[in-house]
Amino acid sequence: MHTRKAITEAIRKLGVQTGDLLMVHASLKAIGPVEGGAETVVAALRSAVGPTGTVMGYASWDRSPYEETLNGARLDDKARRTWPPFDPATAGTYRGFGLLNQFLVQAPGARRSAHPDASMVAVGPLAETLTEPHELGHALGKGSPVERFVRLGGKALLLGAPLNSVTALHYAEAVADIPNKRWVTYEMPMLGRNGEVAWKTASEYDSNGILDCFAIEGKPDAVETIANAYVKLGRHREGVVGFAQCYLFDAQDIVTFGVTYLEKHFGATPIVPAHEAAQRSCEPSG
């Protein structure tokens, strides 16, 4: 049974320091049994960064109608009337991004951003700076909490989470100068100041596959591809927390690498042999 002290020490051994801005992607199952459960893991993370540090997570929303309204799909009138609007103060988190985020949302002093599908949660001195503003159309790219996280010198921590979990690399996808990016549209029920509900349409880069070749089911997406290439450079930290294999990345460094990677291989004039650039595969070309 893992204790708060042991988890805190393991996180610090990875390279987390007092005052850090830390975006966490966690698998509680991978960490293993913990005294006090997920609340203890949150407490350990906050202990690792100290009172001057901030912990951030990707909360999203467990009732997001993203799939139901994707690219012109439409809910029937009854569903639209009864679908709850997004309220950052009460909305549940999307469990596909890890149960830990729900406990971050419930932590004292937590702030949550207003974009329903890409909602971020943060706890610590930078929480308000990170989470506000967050408007539709700015999910993970420019003007988003992820951009502010990167610019403020954040670190991305994978606690047993796979390499396709590095949310900061979606920012790299958004800002990289490459042609043929995929776009999506979807609708979200927004809560007005007077309690009224308004369905609003968002247009965003497709974070599930920024290019066609990264949107093939069963194949690595851009985030996983870039993260694997970055790990080979050895500029990150690795270790074990509980039973979980963990990675710690400097967000600015991995994002800069990701932008360069995408522009090199998929830019208007990619720096790869023409026959390789023309292939549908998104496998690294050297």
Swiss-Prot record:
Q: Which GO terms of type biological process are on file?
A: response to antibiotic
Matching Pfam families: Antibiotic_NAT
- Alphabetically list the UniProt keywords: Acyltransferase, Antibiotic resistance, Transferase
InterPro entries, per this entry?
Amioglycoside_AcTrfase, Antibiotic_NAT-like
Molecular function (GO) terms for this protein are:
aminoglycoside 3-N-acetyltransferase activity
The UniProt record lists the EC number as 2.3.1.81
What reaction does this enzyme carry out catalytically? a 2-deoxystreptamine antibiotic + acetyl-CoA = an N(3)-acetyl-2-deoxystreptamine antibiotic + CoA + H(+)
Q: Which family does it belong to?
A: Belongs to the antibiotic N-acetyltransferase family.
Main function: Resistance to antibiotics containing the 2-deoxy-streptamine ring including gentamicin, kanamycin, tobramycin, neomycin and apramycin.
Under what name is this protein listed? Aminoglycoside N(3)-acetyltransferase III
In its UniProt entry, the species of origin is given as Acinetobacter baumannii
Write the lineage as a comma-separated list. Answer: Bacteria, Pseudomonadati, Pseudomonadota, Gammaproteobacteria, Moraxellales
Q: Which gene encodes it?
A: aacC2
